[in-house]
């Protein structure tokens, strides 16, 4: 039974991806089964885990229901990854049109829920449907933030 953890903050550059990849790798080193679902179109968790961000299918195909979740998973020595790239930016259109659109990721992750000890969702730096999906799917949320005054301002 998995623990699904979304790593989120609407601000970019605060360390969400670094936290996600480091937690995943540390838990893998402890013998845990881990998966990163990269929901950021920048695909930095994907490349940070050593996966080509243009390998498909990935998060976009999963959300658009063009691929099965098992076909989207890439195995690495550091943990498993569902890759992302700039194509994921188009997922919002697929989500807007989807029935129960805020549950698309939750429903997809149910299929692999018992295969992993931890599933990390690396969220984009925004509050839109991808992030909403991640938050609905998650059991817990880690909000990464700097502690200086300007860190709490958003553009």
Where are these regions (language model features)?
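P-loop NTP-binding core
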Residues: 1-150, 155
């Amino acid at each position: 039974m998995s623990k699904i953890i979304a790593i989120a903050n609407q601000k970019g550059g605060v360390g969400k991806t670094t936290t996600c990849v480091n937690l995943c790798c540390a838990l893998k080193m402890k013998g845990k089964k881990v998966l990163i679902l990269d929901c950021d179109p920048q695909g930095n968790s994907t490349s940070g885990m050593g996966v080509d961000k243009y390998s498909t299918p990935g998060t976009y195909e999963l959300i658009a229901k063009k691929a099965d979740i098992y076909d989207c998973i890439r195995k690495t020595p550091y943990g498993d990854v569902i890759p992302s790239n700039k194509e994921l930016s188009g997922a919002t259109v697929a989500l807007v049109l989807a029935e129960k659109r805020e549950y698309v990721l939750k429903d997809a992750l149910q299929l692999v829920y018992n295969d992993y000890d931890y599933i990390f969702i690396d969220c984009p730096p925004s509050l839109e449907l991808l992030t909403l999906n991640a938050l609905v799917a998650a059991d817990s949320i880690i909000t990464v933030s700097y502690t200086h005054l300007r860190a709490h301002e958003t553009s």
